[in-house]
């Protein structure tokens, strides 16, 4: 069994790490360079950096901050936010990113997935999906959860896989920041439909939630933000707990 990954996420707004609940009510959570270094030293398997206002505000992710974080960590680094064309990908990879996460731009221009996979390899392309459970199933949203689309979660992620996405980062907007556990039923459905890794996001509040994402949700990795930023869960203790639960971690 492949080792499960634990991934802290830095949600960046105006150069600072922030964390909200259900995608709103953002509060400060610390200096991203310091947090990135700390997580790398504590044994995080990867780090994700999402410039959460880039797509909404229509500006480019600041490569300089990416460069500073990358210089201070020794783990794989995924960067997302405001990536609309291959030149954006090139700039961020040159700044030290290992993978690129695309969300709104992929829904608007699905060909971008094909282009990134062709030019840089599928392993670079992470499809991020913000989805909300509605009466009509799981619907995908644009621009940091602000605009509902007609894309259905499973159908869209399957299309992205066919186009060359190497991973899916699925955030449940219903669960984001509320710390009651991940969307395990939806995760398990994705895992059964896709052959690429699925990263769980949205809902971590205690160690059991990570266990459940891996056992019930069949996720390959679990991402969290506030529980790590505010010291509620420490990564070495989490890995020790998961190991005791019979889950293979790095």
Swiss-Prot record:
Gene Ontology molecular function: imidazoleglycerol-phosphate synthase activity; lyase activity
Pfam families, A to Z: His_biosynth
InterPro entries membership: Aldolase_TIM, His_biosynth, HisF, IGPS_HisA/HisF, RibuloseP-bd_barrel
Family statement drawn from the similarity comment of this UniProt entry: Belongs to the HisA/HisF family.
Annotated metabolic or biological route of this protein: Amino-acid biosynthesis; L-histidine biosynthesis; L-histidine from 5-phospho-alpha-D-ribose 1-diphosphate: step 5/9
Signal peptide: none
EC number: 4.3.2.10
Record's subcellular location: Cytoplasm
Catalytic residue list: 11, 130
Record function comment: IGPS catalyzes the conversion of PRFAR and glutamine to IGP, AICAR and glutamate. The HisF subunit catalyzes the cyclization activity that produces IGP and AICAR from PRFAR using the ammonia provided by the HisH subunit.
Record GO biological process: L-histidine biosynthetic process
Coiled coil regions in record: none
Enzyme class: lyase
Organism, scientific name: Bacteroides fragilis (strain YCH46)
Quaternary structure note: Heterodimer of HisH and HisF.
Catalytic activity, as annotated: 5-[(5-phospho-1-deoxy-D-ribulos-1-ylimino)methylamino]-1-(5-phospho-beta-D-ribosyl)imidazole-4-carboxamide + L-glutamine = D-erythro-1-(imidazol-4-yl)glycerol 3-phosphate + 5-amino-1-(5-phospho-beta-D-ribosyl)imidazole-4-carboxamide + L-glutamate + H(+)
Keywords assigned by UniProt, alphabetized: Amino-acid biosynthesis, Cytoplasm, Histidine biosynthesis, Lyase
This protein's name: Imidazole glycerol phosphate synthase subunit HisF
Originating gene: hisF
GO CC entries: cytoplasm
